[in-house]
Amino acid sequence: LSLHDALPIYNGWNLIDSVELCIQLKALGVDLIDVSSGGAIHNAKIDAKPGFQVPFATAIRTEANIPTAAVGLITEPEQAEHIITTGEADAVFLARAMLRNPRWALMASEKLGHRIDWALPLDRGRTA
C-alpha cells in the first residue's frame, strides 16, 4: 500500500486515508499490509534515507491495529532486526538488498550470530 503520495500541495492520499482503508481491509480478512509510500509520480518529494518508510509501517500497525511489513532502504541485518524486535513492524521486506546480494539472508544470520541448520546434502553449498 502506498501510504501517501508525497504530494501535500495537492491534498492527495495521506496517512488518514490509509488508516481508514487498512481498517476496512482488516475487516475483509487482509492479514498484513506491505507499507510503502510515494514515488509513483515524478514530482513527489521524498526524503529517501535508510529506513525512511519504517515510521509509516509503525503508524498503520498502531492506528489500524493490523500487522505490517516495513520497506525502504533496509539494507543491514541489525537494522532489520531492530525494526522487528522493537515492534516497529511485524515483518521486513527486502528487495534491492537481496537483488544486490542473493545470499543476504545467510550473511545476516552469520552477522547476527544465528545458526541455520542445513540438510546434510546441501551443507557444502552453503559456503561453496
Residue ranges of model-derived segments:
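Flavin-dependent oxidoreductase catalytic cores
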Residues: 3-128
